[in-house]
Amino acid sequence: MKVLGIESSCDETGVAVYDTALSGVPALRAHAVYSQIALHAEYGGVVPELASRDHVRKLLPLIRQTLGEAGVGIDELDGVAYTAGPGLVGALLVGAGVARSLAWALDVPAIGVHHMEGHLLAPLMEDDPPEPPFVALLVSGGHTQLVSVKALGSYEVLGETLDDAAGEAFDKTAKMMGLPYPGGPQLAALAETGTPGRYRFARPMTDRPGLDFSFSGLKTQVLLAWRSSDQSDTTRADIARGFEDAVVDTLVIKCLRALDAAECNTLVVAGGVGVNKRLRARLQEAAQRRGGRVCFPRPALCTDNGAMIAFAGALRLQAGERADAAVHVTPRWDMAALPPLAAGRDSGVEIREW
């Protein structure tokens, strides 16, 4: 089954072709992402209307490019998957409209995919994928969640942020220290040059039971430290290091608690913040100490992309799910409300190849 995946939930246009007749890395026949960073840089953040208009301009050319790179004719597609939420409503509607129109024209099924389920399942596209049960840390600019995955499609949210997501805290902290947009990656790179321990900030909500997160207070603490400092380049790097250490420590502590709570020893990490080098290293060290395993997708599949949508959509199409003819999106969507997969990779149920 060859599935076209379309991602347009925010400021990146992603397209991919996933082939269920293959497995591991080769199953992803091709994928491409167009980033709108340059478009939004002068505003210091994503402008929803501009994002939607740019998806309109870029989506069809990107589909043609990706099909060409995959060596797949448009009439060879067996299904179309698209991000149906959560995300910016206008941006979502662009992808959904193109996907539903294409599926109708080709007379193939379409399926709307939950954006965060796509992230969660992304590590399963790699060689030697993790098998449920496992705990997933979904950490991005819009979400920070710990999810218990008992089976594919069966999700229980164990904890989530009560305010800012981790990626959002990175971006906002970078902006208030004068770093260019997008700030999160810039701050992480700067932290590599900072002195560990010169600035030590709180590890929010780690001094009490529970698996929820809160990063707004940490952000304020960093702001006060920055305002009272000499604001030199050296101090900026040291504060960046202190902030990153605080976020990473918090995420690691909560992940270990979640593994204990779920009585599980496999951790999956996905989402844009999953590319952070210090977070990856610390989680790998923690997993080794407890004799467990931590799984990441390749960095290109941590940020928003069409590959994760094609893969998640393929699993749900194979399970018999279909979207109706209406173009419907859900800007706010609880992943725990998703129907379980009746069939899917590593689910113990035989998959029907198309």
Swiss-Prot record:
SUPFAM superfamilies in the record: Actin-like ATPase domain
Principal location class: cytoplasm
Pfam families per record: TsaD
Keyword Metal-binding attached: yes
Domain of life: Bacteria
Keyword terms: Acyltransferase, Cytoplasm, Iron, Metal-binding, Transferase, tRNA processing
One MF term in the entry's GO annotations: N(6)-L-threonylcarbamoyladenine synthase activity
UniProt-annotated location(s): Cytoplasm
Biological processes per GO annotation: tRNA threonylcarbamoyladenosine modification
Cofactor binding: number and manner: Binds 1 Fe(2+) ion per subunit.
Cofactor(s) for this UniProt protein: Fe(2+)
Gene Ontology CC entries for this record: cytoplasm
Binding-site list for substrate: 138-142, 171, 184, 276
Keyword set includes Acyltransferase: yes
EC number: 2.3.1.234
Binding site for Fe cation: 115, 119, 304
Record function comment: Required for the formation of a threonylcarbamoyl group on adenosine at position 37 (t(6)A37) in tRNAs that read codons beginning with adenine. Is involved in the transfer of the threonylcarbamoyl moiety of threonylcarbamoyl-AMP (TC-AMP) to the N6 group of A37, together with TsaE and TsaB. TsaD likely plays a direct catalytic role in this reaction.
Homology family: Belongs to the KAE1 / TsaD family.
HAMAP family given in the database record: TsaD
PANTHER family (alphabetical): TRNA N6-ADENOSINE THREONYLCARBAMOYLTRANSFERASE, TRNA N6-ADENOSINE THREONYLCARBAMOYLTRANSFERASE, MITOCHONDRIAL
The name this protein goes by in its record: tRNA N6-adenosine threonylcarbamoyltransferase
